[in-house]
Amino acid sequence: MPVSPAIPELHARIVAALTQARHDAKLRQVDLAKRLGWQQAYVSRYETGERMLAVDEYVAVTRALGVDPVALLAQVLDGEDGGVD
């Protein structure tokens, strides 16, 4: 789903990278939510741009995905395509 135009571009790129990382990990939203102790709707809301993630939530999501939070953010800031190696 496209990210809402109401959220800033940087946040949209971060969300795209997180969503791609989830897909790369072959996890459904419900699987990620379970790892985090969240409801699936919460994952959906941040992935669609309905809700912004706080920094601590971003770190929790990256760790649940097995992705380094600093490396992912560096890729986004460096203008990478949002994918995770």
Located regions from the model:
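Short basic helix-loop element that most often maps to the first helix and adjoining turn
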Residues: 16-35, 60
